[in-house]
Amino acid sequence: MKHLLRGLFIAVLFICCNFQLVLAQPMQELPVDKNVRIGKLDNGLTYYIRHNALPEKRVEFYIAQKVGSILEEPQQRGLAHFLEHMAFNGTKHFPGDETGLGIVPWCETKGIKFGTNLNAYTSVDQTVYNISNVPTENINVVDSCLLILHDWSSAINLADKEIDKERGVIREEWRSRNSGMLRIMTDAQSTLYPDSKYSDCMPIGSIDVINNFPYQDIRDYYAKWYRPDLQGIVIVGDINVDEIEAKLKKVFADVKAPVNPAERIYYPVADNQEPLIYIGTDKEVKNPYVNIFFKQDATPDSLKNTIAYYATQYMVSMAMNMLNNRLNELRQTANPPFTSASAEYGNYFLAKTKEALALDASSKIDGIDLAMKTVLEEAERARRFGFTASEYERARANYLQAVE
C-alpha cells in the first residue's frame, strides 16, 4: 500500500530536480518569523502575538484548545461540541443576564457579528474559538476581547438553565446534520478503526447523551480538559505587540495551572494485514460512492518545521494536483467512467495519528466497479510512469496563483 504514495512522490521528484538539493539538508529547521512574539506563562499557556498593518485598525483573536471529541468518555459523547456552544451562553465577565450583556450581544454592539466574526468549531482533536475583524480604535474593545479569551479558557458559567436551553439547539443541529452520508460515515468508523478510540468519536455525538446528560458531566469535561497547558492564544493585527503582551499576562494571571492533570493522549491507529472493507447503504444516498485509503504513519510534529517536510508537502501537493487533473479530464470525456473522482493526501479520515492517500469516486447506479477500477489504474499509472513536464508546469502555476 505504501509503495503507491512513494511512487507518486518519486514521480514528482524526477521533474523537480532542484528539490534534490533542498533535501540534502533534511533536518534543517525553518526560522521562526522574528516578528512573532512567542511566550509561555507560568501556568503553561502559550501565546503568539504579531503586528500586521493590513487591514488597518483591525485585529484577530484566537484561542485554540488541544482537545476535542476524541477525549470524551462514553457518557460524554457530544459534550465537547456542546461545551463550545455553552461558551457563548454566559461567562464570568459576560454573564448574559440582568447583571450584564453576554458575549454575543456585546460583540454585536461593536460590529462583531456572530457566525461571521465571532465563531468556533469543534473537531476530533481540537476546539478553536475566534473573534475576527475587531476594530482597534477603541482600546476598551480590544481589552474586552482579551477578557472573552480569558473566560473561554477558564470561566464559562455552565448554568443549569442555560444547559437545558442549549439541549434544544443541539438537537436541531443534530437533526439538520443527520444526513444519509453522515449516517454511513458514522457507521463506517468501527470498520475503519477497529478496537480504537476513533471508532466512535464524531463531534456531533449521541442524541441520547445530549438529551439526558447530568449537568456535572459537562462541568467535569470542562475542568479536566480546558486548561492552560493545552491552550494557545493567537493575536494578529494592527496592534502594539508590547502592550498586548503585557495586558495578556495580566488578564491570564489568575488562570491556575492544573494539579495532577490528566494525560492528553494521542490515540494510535493500528496497521492491518488485510484490507478493511465497509459497505453501507442508506435510503437517502441514491448513487454509489467509493473511498479507498492507503494508510501510513503520520509525520511527527517534531519534523514539521524542517525544510524536508515542506519540500515533501510541496511535492505531494503537486502529485495530487496532477493526478486530479487527469481524473478531471476523464470526467469530461464523452463516456466518463465516473461522475466524480478525486485524490487527496492528509489525515486518515478522522485520525491525526495516521495519514493516508485517499482515492474517491462516485458513479451512476451500475457504474461503481468501473469507477473504482479507473481511479486505481490512474494512480498506478502515475506511480509507474510519472508525470510530464508540461503537467508539472500547469500544476506549479496553479500552486503559485493560489499562494499569491
Where are the regions that the model predicts?
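Non-catalytic, conformational "gating/processing" segments within enzyme and secreted inhibitor domains
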Residues: 167, 181, 216-250
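M16/insulysin-pitrilysin zinc metalloprotease superfamily fold
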Residues: 90, 131-166, 330, 348-404
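Histidine-acidic residue clusters that define the catalytic metal-binding segment
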Residues: 25-37, 129-132, 139, 147, ...
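Acidic/histidine-enriched alpha-helical segments
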Residues: 99-105, 157-175, 186, 240, ...
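His/Glu-based metal-binding/catalytic segments typifying zinc-dependent metallopeptidases
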Residues: 260-327, 360
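An aromatic/glycine/proline-enriched structural segment found at the starts
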Residues: 195, 232-291, 397, 401-403
